[in-house]
From Swiss-Prot:
Gene this chain is encoded by: RPL4
Its job: Component of the large ribosomal subunit. The ribosome is a large ribonucleoprotein complex responsible for the synthesis of proteins in the cell.
Protein's UniProt name: Large ribosomal subunit protein uL4
Biased composition (Gly residues): 82-91
Compartments reported by the entry: Cytoplasm
Ribosomal protein as UniProt keyword: yes
Family that this chain belongs to: Belongs to the universal ribosomal protein uL4 family.
Known partners and oligomeric status: Component of the large ribosomal subunit.
Keywords: Cytoplasm, Ribonucleoprotein, Ribosomal protein
Region called Disordered, residue ranges: 77-96
Taxonomic placement: Eukaryota, Amoebozoa, Evosea, Archamoebae, Mastigamoebida
Organism: Entamoeba histolytica (strain ATCC 30459 / HM-1:IMSS / ABRM)
Chief localisation class: cytoplasm
Superkingdom as given in the UniProt entry: Eukaryota
Length: 431
């Protein structure tokens, strides 16, 4: 629903606003009910269907008769005659070739749907109210960025002088509504399927709807040749042209005479309608459409139960498995771990240096042993006419190279010092 009390009238020739304003009709304050509009639209759209069905003679245009019993064949009617492969074949049944379908569609189905009169009127009022909400109009796909106001009202003088389509296009450009027509032109596509052969070749979007009064009849022929633009008398408004595809919020261009007739046709919340007997615009059940304002209102909060705030259960972690919990309980554990890592790194470096040193000693001893063996058994030997150096086997090397007593005493002393330092450091950090 619109909250605008007055509506400005625009001149279609100059595109400027006039000084006179019109009070917003009460029908724009009607409640917007999408469920009612959906029900009415579905029922009314079914009333335009053309009855269709299967011919009563389909699948039965053969000369066929059943052979009866006694021939060990089915009793289905069979094609009469002889001398052809077609003769004797089953006919008529839905399981036979060229037979009729099962349960053929009849044309005496329930094609029309009745809708309560008051519900139809209520749905039209809801669609008119939705057309005054810019958010709904824009959400439906209309291009209204340059439109001066919603609802858009054009004075009747500029409409009544229009006789040619180029004059109607000029008016739409002046009120910044032609961008919606360009959208329709760009959306033209060829329909897929059999509809191309049945008068529905082109698919296109819907453009603005021009609603006129009795004084603006000659402009209808000018507007009807513009793609996507529809025209309708204010007395003949229906859900089919106000909400195409059952989507409310169509962009409507009102003439001044048609806009002033709305209170007479639909009435107000207090006064009965003259154009629709027994109809009165319903009051909106929701006075404030802003749901955010309703939710955070202080008046509502007083009536509601206070929110229950449950105490948060502390998350307990095992410090022996969770390193972050251990550091939180004992900050020194991080420092101790860092120091232990440094000690382990230093020990690894010392061990690597010692291994490299021992490797050099073993290599030197192996070379000395090779030289002594060469002197004893000859420096070289001839194999297949080539001179080859004598190699010492590993077993002989292992038996020959051994630690001296002095080296064993040094290694025992070194291991004892390492163990003593580790024990002393562990006592110092408290492990």
């Amino acid at each position: 629903m619109s909250s605008r009390p007055f509506v400005t009238i625009y001149d279609g020739i100059t595109g400027e606003a006039e000084k006179t304003q019109v009070r917003l009709p009460a029908v724009f304050l009607a409640p917007i009910r999408g469920d009612v509009v959906h029900f009415v639209y579905r029922n009314q759209s079914k009333n335009t269907r053309q009855p269709e069905g299967v011919s009563t003679e389909a699948g039965k245009q053969h000369s066929a008769i059943s052979w009866g019993t006694g021939r060990a064949v089915a009793r289905i009617p069979r094609i009469s005659g002889s001398g052809s492969g077609r003769n004797g074949q089953g006919a008529f049944g839905n399981m036979t070739r060229k037979g009729h379908m099962f349960s053929p569609l009849k044309n005496f189905r329930k094609w029309q749907r009745k809708t309560p009169k008051q519900m139809r009127r209520f749905a039209v009022a809801s669609c008119i109210a939705a057309s005054a909400v810019p958010a709904l109009v824009s959400a439906r796909g209309h291009h209204i960025a340059g439109v001066p106001q919603i609802p858009l009202v054009v004075n009747s003088k500029s409409i009544s002088v229009i006789k040619k389509t180029k004059q109607a296009v000029y008016l739409l450009k002046k009120i910044n509504a032609y961008s919606d027509v360009l959208k329709v032109i760009a959306s033209k596509t060829i329909r897929a399927g059999q509809g191309k052969m049945r008068g529905r070749k082109i698919k296109e979007r819907k453009g603005p709807l021009v609603v006129y009064g009795n004084d603006d009849l000659q402009a209808v022929k000018a507007f009807r040749n513009i793609p996507g633009v529809d025209t309708c008398r204010v007395e003949n408004l229906s859900v089919l042209n106000l909400a195409p595809g059952c989507h409310m919020g169509r962009f409507i261009i009102w003439t001044e005479s048609a806009f002033k007739k709305l209170n007479t046709i639909f009435g107000t919340q207090k006064k009965m309608a003259q154009g629709k007997s027994g109809f009165r615009i319903a009051h909106a059940q929701m006075v404030v459409p802003d749901m955010k304002r309703v939710v955070v209102a202080a008046e509502k909060a007083k009536l509601l139960r206070a929110k229950i705030v449950l105490p948060k259960v502390p998350k307990r972690a095992n410090p022996l498995k969770n390193w972050a919990a251990m550091v939180k309980l004992n900050p020194y554990a991080k420092i101790a771990s860092h120091k232990l890592a440094q000690v382990a790194k230093a020990q690894a470096v010392h061990k690597a240096q010692y291994a490299a040193k021992m490797e050099k000693i073993l290599a030197a001893k192996k070379e000395a042993l090779n030289q002594s063996v060469a002197k004893r058994f000859g420096k070289t030997q001839k194999v297949d006419g080539k001179v080859v150096k004598v190699k010492v086997e590993n077993n002989l090397l292992k038996a020959t190279v051994k630690r001296t007593a002095k080296q064993d005493a040094y290694m025992k002393k070194y291991d004892g010092i390492v163990k003593a330092n580790a024990k002393k450091y562990a006592e110092k950090i408290g492990f």
